[in-house]
Amino acid sequence: KPRFAEIDEIAELNQTKVIAAMQKNRVNATHFAASTGYGYDDEGRDNLERVYASAFHTEAALVRPQITCGTHALAIALSANLLPGDEMLAISGKPYDTLEEVIGLRESPCSLKEYGVSYAQVDLREDGSFDFPAIERALNDKTKLIHIQRSKGYCPRPTISVDAIGEA
């Protein structure tokens, strides 16, 4: 198939998935009405989150215009899932530079480190694969979250495949 035909096919499948999620959650005109802005009883916002959860096959979704970038979304997710005394283990090497302050690799007020969350890291092997023996050695009772950065970001390595993440 020509590349543009593949892209069109993917776009159509995604559109069908979103329409099905909207139908499942019975989106109607009332969901587009203005709200008080206080966030209480905002059925439109709540239903939008159900649509996202349905479309992406997740338990729940948090969809807010106040989440301004990927780092902001990751900071929220990390803060929500880690408590003082917990450890975050990165198994694909050092995360994006923008997460360094969130984690506390660079000093920053309100970082996970300042909150009492520790950080450990296992680098990828030279061939870009996960180092499973090193990961097993790094796991401990405090490890509560394993971070995998699929994107290569600014690192000279290939993007980690979904299959490789599934194996991890």
Where are the language model's segments positioned?
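Glycine-rich phosphate-binding segment of PLP-dependent enzymes
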Residues: 1-58
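Acidic, glycine-rich active-site loops and adjacent beta-strand->loop/helix elements
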Residues: 92-97, 152
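Conserved beta-loop-alpha segment that forms the PLP phosphate-binding cup at the N-terminus of a helix
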Residues: 61-87, 95-106
